[in-house]
């Protein structure tokens, strides 16, 4: 009598099941799992928060053994339009990447610009190499009287009324850096008064004193109205 042989069916592993088992056994390299639902809104908010101005883009060629190798450089000005501004210089094989690098460098070079009623507190002169830029305060409604490179820096800094003059070199990079050097020389009136040992009223511009007087009157009126409302 022949012996009966019972065969047990073995599970067949498909490629998909093998990949799933492998993912369960082996963690991702780096120890962190990618979250497909992560919030990317912060990037868009960061981009919309700042003003970006591409001042100039240059193409640079390098001769190598196999021929010419091209790359691009971008000079970018970034600011919040409220007294914060920075300048960056990016280099890359593609234009968008060069601009992106310039923006990141500009954010690392941020500095604060003192302002008085949308203009600058006092005249300044900035120099960079052979480029010279003169900046002078202007009355309200004058606008930005400046060329392209200087205008880009001033608008990103939030200065809307100013007179400017560029002398010497017409190189765009020199003009931008001369403008930045001039803005970095600006001082608050209170800092100037403290350094010279003078009264604030003697140093501060008359326009600034008028603005501060109106602000103080408005604050006093609001405080008085609040006190009367509480008493009633």
Curated annotation (Swiss-Prot):
Top-level taxon of origin: Bacteria
GO molecular function annotation: rRNA binding; structural constituent of ribosome
Basic and acidic residues compositional bias, start-end: 20-47
Compositional bias ranges of the Polar residues kind: 7-19
Keyword Ribonucleoprotein carried by entry: yes
Region of interest: Disordered: 1-47
Keyword Ribonucleoprotein annotated: yes
Xref: InterPro entries: Ribosomal_Su5_D2-typ_SF (IPR020568), Ribosomal_uS5 (IPR000851), Ribosomal_uS5_bac-type (IPR005712), Ribosomal_uS5_C (IPR005324), Ribosomal_uS5_N (IPR013810), Ribosomal_uS5_N_CS (IPR018192), Ribsml_uS5_D2-typ_fold_subgr (IPR014721)
Domain S5 DRBM: 50-113
GO biological processes: translation
GO CC annotation: small ribosomal subunit
Pfam families assigned to the protein according to its UniProt record, in alphabetical order: Ribosomal_S5, Ribosomal_S5_C
Keyword list, A-Z: Ribonucleoprotein, Ribosomal protein, RNA-binding, rRNA-binding
Function: With S4 and S12 plays an important role in translational accuracy. Located at the back of the 30S subunit body where it stabilizes the conformation of the head with respect to the body.
Comment block on domains: The N-terminal domain interacts with the head of the 30S subunit; the C-terminal domain interacts with the body and contacts protein S4. The interaction surface between S4 and S5 is involved in control of translational fidelity.
Family: Belongs to the universal ribosomal protein uS5 family.
Subunit structure: Part of the 30S ribosomal subunit. Contacts proteins S4 and S8.
Protein name: Small ribosomal subunit protein uS5
């Amino acid at each position: 009598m022949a012996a009966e042989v019972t065969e047990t069916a073995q599970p067949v592993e498909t490629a998909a099941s093998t990949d799933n088992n492998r993912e369960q056994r082996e963690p991702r390299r780096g120890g962190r799992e990618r979250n497909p639902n992560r919030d990317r809104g912060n990037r868009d908010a960061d981009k919309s928060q700042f003003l970006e101005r591409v001042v100039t883009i240059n193409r640079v060629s390098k001769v190598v053994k196999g021929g010419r190798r091209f790359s691009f450089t971008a000079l970018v000005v970034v600011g919040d339009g409220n007294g914060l501004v920075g300048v960056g210089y990016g280099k890359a094989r593609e234009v968008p990447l060069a601009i992106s690098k310039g923006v990141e460098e500009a954010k690392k070079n941020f500095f604060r610009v003192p302002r008085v009623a949308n203009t600058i507190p006092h005249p300044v002169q900035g120099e960079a190499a052979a480029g010279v830029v003169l900046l002078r305060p202007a009355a309200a409604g004058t606008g930005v009287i400046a060329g392209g490179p200087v205008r880009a820096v001033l608008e990103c800094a939030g200065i809307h009324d100013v007179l400017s003059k560029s002398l010497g070199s017409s190189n765009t990079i020199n003009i931008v850096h001369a403008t930045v050097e001039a803005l970095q020389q600006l001082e608050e009136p209170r800092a100037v008064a403290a350094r010279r040992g003078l009264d604030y009223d003697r140093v501060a511009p008359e326009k600034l004193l008028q603005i501060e007087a109106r602000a103080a009157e408005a604050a006093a009126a609001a405080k008085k109205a609040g006190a009367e409302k509480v008493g009633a």
